[in-house]
Amino acid sequence: MYEGPVQDLIDELGRLPGIGPKSAQRIAFHLLAAEPADVTRLQEVLQKVKEGVVFCDICGNVSEEPTCRICRDARRDPAVVCVVEEPKDVLAVERTREFRGRYHVLGGALDPLSGVGPDQLRVRELLTRIGRDEITEVIIATDPNTEGEATATYLVRMLRDFPGLNVTRLASGLPMGGDLEFADELTLGRALSGRRAV
């Protein structure tokens, strides 16, 4: 156990998702050994992200402007919306180059044990979009884990209120319990192409 600012840095890094105590320690000592200009550049980038990145007014993806580039792109099909849990999942689907519609980012998944219910997600905004815009298909692309499946089931129930709306789910091929962001492009592309009605 270290003391003072070194331990504070290790503790803060350890709070980041996917960073355990050993990784936090490795990163902290890397930063201590780095050139001051490199540390300053990292600090500036973190500050810019915190001050300059917002969530898109329409879909909830990250953006430097009130409306993200995907929602502004007239070449995208506004009638097809892919629902994902997090902005990182938008990037995962985009890497497939299979999807030409738009997105809706929920901001998480249902997780009653952690206190995350429908009101903590952007479900209401999705329902408003479907009622307001001419959306004909909703592709549910939540993670293939317990929380993602619960979220998908809940969304399917809510979307039944929209007659004529085609609701589909990504096809199998994604490992149960996995995260969408870690799926390779080929697997995710095939899951998107082979989506099924729910």
Swiss-Prot record:
Toprim domain: residues covered: 79-175
UniProt keyword Metal-binding present: yes
Zinc finger (C4-type): 56-71
Protein name: Recombination protein RecR
Family: Belongs to the RecR family.
Provenance organism: Saccharopolyspora erythraea (strain ATCC 11635 / DSM 40517 / JCM 4748 / NBRC 13426 / NCIMB 8594 / NRRL 2338)
Function: May play a role in DNA repair. It seems to be involved in an RecBC-independent recombinational process of DNA repair. It may act with RecF and RecO.
Listed PROSITE patterns: RECR, TOPRIM
GO BP annotations, alphabetical order: DNA recombination; DNA repair
